[in-house]
Curated annotation (Swiss-Prot):
Keyword tags: Bacterial flagellum biogenesis, Repressor, RNA-binding
Family matches, as Pfam families: FlbT (PF07378)
Native source species: Rhizobium johnstonii (strain DSM 114642 / LMG 32736 / 3841)
Protein name stated in the entry: Probable flagellum biosynthesis repressor protein FlbT
GO molecular function, one term: mRNA 5'-UTR binding
Function in brief: Has a post-transcriptional repressor function in flagellum biogenesis. Associates with the 5'-UTR of fljK mRNA and promotes its degradation.
Family annotation (InterPro entries): Flagellum_FlbT
NCBIfam families per the UniProt record, alphabetical: PRK00794.1-1
Species classification: Bacteria, Pseudomonadati, Pseudomonadota, Alphaproteobacteria, Hyphomicrobiales
BP term (GO), one: mRNA catabolic process
Similarity remark: Belongs to the FlbT family.
Tree of life domain: Bacteria
Amino acid sequence: MKSTLRISLKAGERIFINGAVLRVDRKVALEFLNDVTFLLENHVLQPEGATTPLRQLYFIAQMILINPEGKDHSTALFRKSITMLLSCFRNEEILAELKRIDALVSTGRAFDALKAIRGLYAIEDNILNNHEMPPTMVEQIRREIAPWR
């Protein structure tokens, strides 16, 4: 990290830092003085929210960050998932971004991968709403890459 990073949290808000969950009881500002892996509570996807292929991929990438003990398992599941998604999507923008997301995770930049995945949600919603990906394929993906269900 080249400079410090300052984050403000409201009372009752949680933040996930290097696998630990912290909740603040009042408005606070945190200043990170070195490299840290963190997720703000509003960026944490719960399992029941992982309802589409890209949201499932997000959930898996998120687990790489917030569950360091299970990082190897989550990374293996991410590899399986990204391979499946690359063969299922036809949209060139999504395919190019999935390749970039794979490279981000491969180089230890899962946090950046999460941001990139969130950026694809609108395109994915369009694809699913227009049935450009058959519902049977969506269901197959859901079954294959959702072991937490």
